Amino acid sequence: MFRMRLNAEQVGRKFEVSDDELTVVARRMSDAMDAGLWRNEQPGALATIRCWDTRVPRLSPPAVTDAVVPKFLSLDLCHSDRFCTRFTTIMLNAHDEVRTRSREHSLTPSTLMTGKVANLFDHVASGLAEFADEFHMRRVGLPLALTLGFPVWHAGALGGEASLCRWTKGFGCADTMSGDVAAEFRVAAARADVVVGPVAVFNDACVAMMHGAADRSDTRVALVVDDGCNCCYVSEFGRTVINTEWGAFGEDGALDHLLTKYDRQLDVRSQNPSKQIYEKMTSGMYMTELVREAVLEIASNQAMFEGRTTNAMKTEYAIKAKHLWIVESDRSRSHSAVRTVLTEVLDVTDPSDMDCELFRYVCRCITKRSANLIAAGLSVVLRRTGFPVTVVIDGSAFKTHSEYALMVGSKARQLTPHQTKFTLRTVDRTRGQDSRIVARVLASIPASGGAR
């Protein structure tokens, strides 16, 4: 039993990151952000973190007198444990009361994620057609808010032209979009015989910022940790949102000193080798794969499951982020949730209490490293805000994991000067004011600019 625990701890210690190392990470990330901001002024300059400026509408609770569209469609191309697109109709009234109707449309087969962009968009548009038929909206031409969890560059104000710069999170379409994402999706919708009005493309972190700002006027940072990770913050002068796209941090070798052999194995097998290094060390999609690799090695060393391995343990991405959050949140003496994941997901027969404890230990080591690295990044952003702020947090890591937000907040406070005060606050999607901000963006798009 001692040998089993020792073997697991030897693996777990590989994921430890000291405070001194986190300070180095923060300094290097700050330098990378400076380079990204400089790149906006000097397009030829090199930068791993893009730090794109995005002009957004006033990030404060909108007034009833603001021009808005009373009804619009929302389309969220998401991953999050199930490959799907989420369609929603949103109806507003003057009192910010919201009525919604939602459906999810599967993105199977998974070859859609690695084929041609046109095929992916045609599949999404066919789901939109089914949704429109169900609610008799095929010919209505409602405005559309299109949310993407990928790096998106806005040429000007939110609601203007937007370009998809890179596929991430397991997507790896063979071709790239030649121009405006909104225009390309309108073409796909037309092929599906669905009429849509003005289309605005939103980044997931910017959407989180809007949700937070609708509730708290001091919201100046949005942090998302899901199958990917990103952060945006309001610029010093309050006129733009800086979309960091910090998942790419480390592509220049800045994180090489922290990479374990499991990180390197995962990177080589991924859809985008040598890209999105920070994201691969912190996001739910990749954390679970690191857990699987580590557990497979420990079991192969006869230190878990009596040395038995299963086909599920050898299957890439067999463990989903939701399983990791379930395991981490299990505090029962019987390890009931851990045991369920081991038996139903990894096909382990009759796992012992020690197996459950060691599995949870490995999960905790990898999750803690993620939280610490995210905290290092957050500390960099907080130093740039300069006064007390609310940080709105979103994504499955914060929503589902019982302690992830606490770990991030605690470590960020250690790494940030004491005079920098901040509050972490989860997104409240039950309010109508956030939808009103999106509706205000859609209303700002000229009707004649239907291709946007």
Task: State the predicted function of each range.
Residues 148-154, 205-208, 396-399, 429-431:
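Short, internal active-site loops enriched in acidic
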Residues 228-229, 249, 292, 398:
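Short, glycine-/Ser/Thr-/acidic-enriched flexible segments
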Residues 103-125, 129, 152-214, 221, ...:
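Glycine-rich phosphate-binding loop and adjoining helix at the ATP-binding site
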